[in-house]
């Protein structure tokens, strides 16, 4: 096994399963997820909760098997950008800080970007099916995930005003 292809396989499995777990966690209690989304400033929170669950389960599954890899990675980048911009950036960098900093979502975003750029490797369905986004489009698709996340924040999120104000 080529070490690069083996490494990409491991990254896809770990990140894919992690993102699937996030989506399943949201999906198990959509009403609770929607209430939390509303509390942290999202408009249309019930829709956002459903979309979050579907996106995370779908993108994680696609990344896991290496199908449409740059698009799956872009969806993960978008999701982590929304998480960083709406919640984690206000709590500093480190994940162990109160409220959880942006360290974790940053790392997931960069790993997803690298996977978008390199593709899923030899052990991905993209390779088996002859799907290749190319050296130019793959990183651009990853960057489009960042733009989609920023767009999501602009359209659907406002920082909540603390109750004491």
Where in the sequence are the language-model features?
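Extended, low-polarity transmembrane helix blocks
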Residues: 1-28, 32, 46, 50, ...
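Short amphipathic alpha-helical coupling elements at transmembrane boundaries
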Residues: 32-39
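Conserved functional loop/turn residues at catalytic and ligand-binding sites
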Residues: 41, 66
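Hydrophobic, membrane-inserted alpha-helices
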Residues: 54-63
């Amino acid at each position: 096994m080529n070490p690069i292809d083996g490494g990409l396989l491991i990254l896809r499995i770990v990140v894919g399963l992690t993102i699937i777990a996030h989506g399943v966690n949201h999906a198990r209690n959509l009403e609770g997820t929607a209430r939390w989304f509303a509390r942290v400033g999202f408009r249309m929170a019930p829709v956002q909760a459903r979309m979050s669950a579907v996106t995370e389960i779908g993108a994680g599954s696609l990344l896991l098997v290496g199908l449409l890899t740059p698009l799956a990675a872009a969806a993960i980048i978008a999701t982590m950008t929304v998480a960083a911009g709406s919640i984690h950036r206000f709590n500093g960098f480190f994940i162990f800080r109160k409220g959880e900093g942006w360290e974790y979502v940053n790392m997931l975003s960069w790993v997803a970007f690298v996977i978008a750029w390199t593709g899923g490797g030899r052990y991905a369905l993209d390779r088996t099916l002859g799907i290749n986004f190319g050296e130019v489009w793959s990183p651009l698709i990853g960057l489009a995930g960042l733009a989609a996340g920023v767009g999501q924040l602009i359209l659907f999120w406002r920082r909540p005003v603390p109750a004491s104000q």
